[in-house]
Every structure is written in structure tokens, then in C-alpha cells.
Amino acid sequence: MAGRYGSQVMTMTVTNTPSADLAFTNLAYCSSSDLRQFSVPGSDLFLANVADSFILSLCGHGSIRDGNIALNAIQRRHARVSTGDMVSVSRFVPPENFDLAMLTLELEFVKKGTKSEQVDAALLSTQLKRKYTNQVLTVGQKATFEYHGTNYILTVNRADVEGQDHTNGIERGLLSKDTYIVFEASNASGIKIVNQREAASSNIFKHKEFNLESLGIGGLGAEFADIFRRAFASRVFPPHVTSRLGIKHVKGMLLFGPPGTGKTLMARQIGKMLNGKDPKIVNGPEVLSKFVGETEKNVRDLFADAEQDQRTLGDASELHVIIFDEIDAICKSRGSTRDGTGVHDSIVNQLLTKIDGVEALNNVLLIGMTNRKDLLDEALLRPGRLEVQVEISLPDEAGRLQILQIHTNKMKENSFLGTDINLQELAARTKNYSGAELEGVVKSATSYALNRQLSMDDLTKPVEEENIKITMEDFLHAIYEVQPAFGASTDDLERCRLNGMVDCGHRHNHIYKRAMLLVEQVKVSTRSPLVTCLLEGPSGSGKTALAATIGIDSDFPYVKIVSAETMIGLSESTKCAHIVKVFEDAYKSPMSIIILDDIERLLEFIAIGPRFSNIISQTLMVLLKRLPPKGKKLLVFGTTSEVTFLESVGISDCFSVTHSVPTLQKEDAKKVLNQLNLFSEDDVDSAAEALNDMPIKKIYMLIEMAAQGENGGSAEAIYAGREKININHFYDCLGDFIRFTG
């Protein structure tokens, strides 16, 4: 709401105000003849836009010569002019409905020192309106004001005109007798505002609004809004409001989630945004001491400053923020640590006493961070303690885009980003990447661009900065190089199908299609957050390769394979913990696939006896039936060659669907041999006949043996297509193969 300006812009000479007392009026002064040019039609107001910075009310003064305008020191500083300078001045005509509905002013002393004052907001508002009514005030403008013998500087922090859209221009308005004025003062100013009602007092924060991207926080808008509502909304209001509501401030919050998602960053930025004491940042293990009682004293010392302020200042005390990184290191469940000292139990007791004890502090905000919430003592998580618990999870695609924009912002500003960069595509490609991993991708991409400008033969060669360009190809290389901790284990899955996938006939194709329907069901259904499928069949029939192919083709962000080969030599309890961790990690991803390969091997099954691990069996049965958290979806595939055993122990009943993966019949084997093209056309039928009812894995092994030739050295020519496998040698290999494997 800019108003209208006079058609004529004057250039006037800046002078001092005629007398010291006029400096406190916030008026500008000029000659009587010049004053007429700034008259607002239909009123007795004289308004001028000075240097396109702010609007001042003018008054005529006999000592001011024509062509001069008198400004006080504060006004000259705001207009960035000195006495004797020329400044542009034009008439300002306010638009309709220009009266201020609400005005927020920050108070500070003109002479800063150790003096402290208590200011009555109601009396100051009355005095201010008496002197400043019908003046136009602009956000950012400063004015000097004398109140009860003390000189103050007023800074306009907010100017709200009813119905005005702040996005359309500068925030300003006309002070009227109906304007509601809110006064603010920083804790360091020495000014205490009393008798102020009905309006929020936002001096708890250093800034009046938050731009999370400028703080380096991306993809956490919803989480930050939740934190603000629950932990800070009550602190924004004056103490008497919360007192009348009968509520207590939140004293603690817990940020938990996977590593690298921004928990520490958010806690640090929250600490920086708050007015008051600098936050105390404590890494969990730093509190511990080898001396008896010293650890508990270290905890008490963290709260010492807050206790002192509470005693001396009461409700006016500054907020003290204490940030505990890796809080699970010192606040484990009481009784879980068997070190004989009980020091971890004492730490929990000491924290509970300080936060929520008999003499609990009301000026403390404790922020804890952990990726192992399950290790914390339950008493810490109850209301009154770390009651606000916010999960900082892996960012979604929109969040990843914000994070990439933050980390590439400087590159873009300095023209280092190539024109082919598509951040939206990169965000789509980086599923389940944490914020830290996305930063790693940007660093890796930058390293490729920088490396192109270096010569290994002469590292002292000057670098031409304008040639540094980070391209889309650099980012694609970086994505391949930096793998997410909670992503799909593509390399592990590819190792499960080293020979690729061939068409094994309609029976295998049917199983693949039915399994992909389960994938689609998990993706779109709101009623099936957990789907489980068991692939059973003879050893070597391709169950693991089929499951791995489904995992790769599913395009799920998290695909993990659990096999006995990664747990060789581990105890039963350690194996259980490993399996549980894989499931817990899967719950952190929106959609996940877990492949339990060779379940009988995981259970340490031996047919003689029989023997198996009951602990692992019970763990699997619980996990296969446990629903993932709300909003998360999980698909579990299991493979086994001992389905009868799994039926006897009840594990097969935990799977919703069971598919039998068969051996290859003659027609299937012929189809495979035709695709491999290693036999002559005349020999394919004979070879397929011999391979009837054989698993695909054994077929591959047999063909590998036959491809070596009778005297060895034939494999290269055969795979290159220059020669074919000799059918007689193939039969010889088949006889040996059956004798040794059958």
C-alpha cells in the first residue's frame, strides 16, 4: 500500500533540527513557503517521502531557509545523508484505509549502559499516541522519544494495516488513536515491559520470521512447525497470559531418527534463533568422569546459570537452552548398565530432578538427540520431561529438492552450475538419501568438476575459475559413488543373479508376475502395509535370483537381503539383533523390501536330530507378523528348500502367500538353451531332453563345465559364437555331474 506521490520531486539541502527538544518529535522541518507543497488535500497533514526511505510529517519553522529540510540524527542515519547533503523529497498522499491496526515497537536506551528501567506499556502507549498521532510509521524506521526523563530509541518492527497485503510493498501506516501498540525489549537492553496485555511478545526469538532455507534446514518444514507449536508457542506470550491459562512451558524435546537427517543441525539452529544465553552443547560422553560424584556434578553445573537467573529474575529470566547430542550414551534405561557404579542411573535421576523435580526450573529448554530412542529411560519421555518427541525422518522428494537447492545455492549464484542441471530429477533419483548423504553427493559432484581443471603433471598450473562447471553427469557419477545407508543394496542383489535372468518358461513367468502384483499391492493399497511371500522349491531352482530380480524391478527405495553368509560365526542373540536391525531400518523408509534368503540356514537347521535355533525362529515369527509404523509399507520375501521343516515349526504360516519355484522341464530347458545359443540347432533337443527336471542353477554349472571343451581352452570361442558345445562331451560332463552331485 504505497500511497500516491506528488508530481514534483524536490531536491533539498539537509540541515540539523532547529533545537534539541524538536529532535524528539519525529518531525521534519522546512520553511513555511516550502511547507505548502507537501499539503495533503482535504486534511491538515503535511507528509513527505524522504529519499524513498520513509514518510515524515513536516512542520514549518521560521529559522529554516527555503530549499532546506531539517532532520534529526536518527532520521539522517536512516536516510543515509549528512548535514549539507542534497536529498530528494516529494509529497506523499496516503491511500484510503491507511490507519495502523497494530504497531510493534522495540525499545532501547539512547545511551547504552548498565542502567535498567521498568516501563509501563499502557502509559507509554498513551504518551506516544499524544505525540505521534497522524504520523506515518514504516517498518525499520527509528525514532527518538523522551519518557519520564529517559531518552529511548523506538524501532518499528511491525506495522499492520487491516486488509493490507505485505507482499505488495513496504509495511507502513498512519498512527491513530485506535492503533494497538505492542512494545518489545531484548533481555540485554535492561528494559522490562510491564502491564502489556492481549498481544504476543515475540522477543524470545532474535528474528521476527523464519526462513528455514536461510538457516540451512531443508525438508523439515512440518517437523519445525510441530516443534514451534508444542515447545515455543506458549513462550511467545507474556508470562501473565500463561499464568492465567494455568499452563507450564515445555521444558524438553527429543529429536530422533536415522543418522544424517538433520537432528543436530536443527537443534543448533533452534539455539541460535532464540534470544538469551548462548546454548550449551554437550556431547553425551563428555559428562562422564572417572571420579565418584563428579559426573552428577557436571550435570548440575549445566543448570547452575539457569538456577541463578530463576532466583534473581523469576519469570523475567532468559531462556537457557541445553543441547544433548547422543543423549542415549548417558541416559540409558536404569538398571540396564552393569558397570557396578550406577553412574548412568544417577545421571537420569539428576536430570529428572532438575527438569521436573520439586524445585523444577521454568527457564530451561533441554533438547536431546538420538538415533536410538529405544535405549532411553522411559521416565525421561513422560510429560514434563522430554515430552515433545519429533521424528526427523528421511526426507521425501520435495524435501530432497530443498536440501539440494540449499547445498547448490552458492554454486548457482556464482555461475558454477551447468545449464543441464535438473535438481528435480536428482531429487527423484536420490530415494532414501539423508540430508548428510545429499551433501556428500554435492561434494562428490564438485570434486569431479574440480578434478577436470587440474593437471596431475603440473599441479602448480593456474586454474581458470570461469571454466569450473558442475554438470548433470558429475551428479550422476556422484549418486553412484555415494550410496544411501537406507537404500537398495543393488550390488548385493546383483550378486544373487550373476548369470542374469533368462526366460525359464511360463511357470517361472507366472510366479514373477504374481510377485510383481504383490509389489503393486504394497505400493497402492492402504489396507496392506505388510505383505509376506515365501518362495519354496528345490535347491538351485532360482528362488534367490527371482527374489533379487523382484527387488530390483520394484523400484523400492529400500531393498535389503538377509542371508546366513553375512552372519558366519555370530551367536544366536547377535544374529537376532542383526535381523531386528534390518527390519527397524526398513521401518524408517516409506516402502521397503526385505529378502530372507535360505531361511533354514538362518535358523541353523540340521536334518539330523533335527536341530534349529528356537530364538531366531521366534524372532522371525514375530517380525513377519509385526505391522510397520503408520505410513510405512513393507514387503518380505523368504526363500527355502526345506518347506516341510518350516511348516513343522510354524514359520510358513507367517507368510501370506507361498509360491513353488519348480525345476525346469524339457520345454523350459530348451527355451533356456536357445537363449544361450551355445549348442548347434541339431543338438538342442537332445541336450534339453537330458536336462529334464534339473534346477536352473545346476544347468548353468553343467553348461559351464561343457563349454571348457575336452582339452580345455574352448570357452572363449564358444561364448564368442565361433564354436558350439560338443554334445558327446556334454553327455560326459552330465554323467560326471550326476555322479558327483546326484
UniProtKB/Swiss-Prot annotation:
Sequence positions that bind ATP: N499, G500, M501, V502, D503, C504, S539, G540, S541, G542, K543, T544, A545, L546
GO molecular function term, any single one: ATP hydrolysis activity
Entry-linked Pfam families: AAA, AAA_lid_3, CDC48_2
GO cellular component: a single term: plasmodesma
Binding site for Mg(2+): T544
SUPFAM superfamilies in alphabetical order: ADC-like (SSF50692), Cdc48 domain 2-like (SSF54585), P-loop containing nucleoside triphosphate hydrolases (SSF52540)
Coiled-coil region list: none
Cofactor: Mg(2+)
Cofactor note: Binds 1 Mg(2+) ion per subunit.
Keyword Nucleotide-binding annotated: yes
Disulfide bonds: none
Catalysed conversion reaction: ATP + H2O = ADP + phosphate + H(+)
InterPro entries, sorted: AAA+_ATPase, AAA_lid_3, Asp_de-COase-like_dom_sf, ATPase_AAA_core, ATPase_AAA_CS, Cdc48_dom2, CDC48_domain_2-like_sf, CDC4_N-term_subdom
Domain of life per record: Eukaryota
EC number of the protein: 3.6.4.6
Alphabetical keyword list: ATP-binding, Cytoplasm, ER-Golgi transport, Hydrolase, Magnesium, Metal-binding, Nucleotide-binding, Protein transport, Repeat, Transport
Oligomeric form and interacting partners: Homohexamer. Binds to SNARE-SNAP complexes to form 20S particles.
Function per UniProt: Required for vesicle-mediated transport. Catalyzes the fusion of transport vesicles within the Golgi cisternae. Is also required for transport from the endoplasmic reticulum to the Golgi stack. Seems to function as a fusion protein required for the delivery of cargo proteins to all compartments of the Golgi stack independent of vesicle origin. Required for maintaining the normal morphology of the Golgi apparatus.
Protein name: Vesicle-fusing ATPase
Gene: NSF
